Amino acid sequence: ISSQEKSIQNMTRALPECKACINNPREIRCYTNENHRIISEMFREMKSACTDNSIDCNFMREMIPHHRGAVRMSENALRFCLCPELVPLLNEIIVSQKKGIKEMECLLKKLDC
């Protein structure tokens, strides 16, 4: 949570410089199409996550695809011309979400989920 709060603060500071970065229509279309694909896949994976009588396990099984979606959306954005202030934030999201995925996968194993 603290890393997410830090990311939000950094994004707020980056806003003025980022407003000056303009992408062309082709870039917007490519970015948007891929983002829609990523989001659809993320929700499909979340909805199809195995459920049982453990809220702990169910929550983590649903959150892992959510975190993967955040990683994929960040990687998608990094393919395009971005405000330089945004690049480290996206990299931070990738690192923190991948760490969260590993932690939840380990917990799932420990809990025999």
Name the predicted role of every residue range.
Residues I1-C113:
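His/Met- and acidic-residue-enriched segments that coordinate or traffic transition-metal cofactors
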